[in-house]
Amino acid sequence: PVNRRPNIPAALGDNDIKFDDEDTDVKFWGLYYSELLSWGDLGELYYFGLDEDDSSGRFTHNRELSTIGLRLYRKPQTSRFDYELEVAFQFGESRASPLSSDIADLDHLTHFGHAELGYSFLHDWHPRLIGQYDFASGDDDPIDGENERFDTLFGARRFDFGPTSIY
């Protein structure tokens, strides 16, 4: 990741020029494969790796996580059912807090699931009815030396009122 410069409002307002800084204490990488399946739907396999360490002025959970997942879906079409199914498993190590005094690495083993079923109606304004279900593991014992809470890595893309696209 890159730390954008300048990052001070006065310097931005003055149109100051500064080189961006690369943050080598956070590394994110991945592999992605997509395939048109024999019955016409789409399938995806993916792997994401995250390795982050504390740096001066920025404390982290020191996450060293691997996420593997599978997604199957059919794109919405008029007068036809569509769906999306996704499962992901996450493993590695992380810490309970970003505090510099927290030096205990916790085992990290979690999972996530998503299911969606929709139908697009034949009408001038193209209405679509959809039902969604998400599940993610949680940490049932915060003092057992394990972190069982699924980590979205960089936060939810949309959390205000679900996938309404209002904002």
Feature locations, PLM:
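Signature for the C-terminal beta-barrel architecture of outer-membrane proteins
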Residues: 1-146
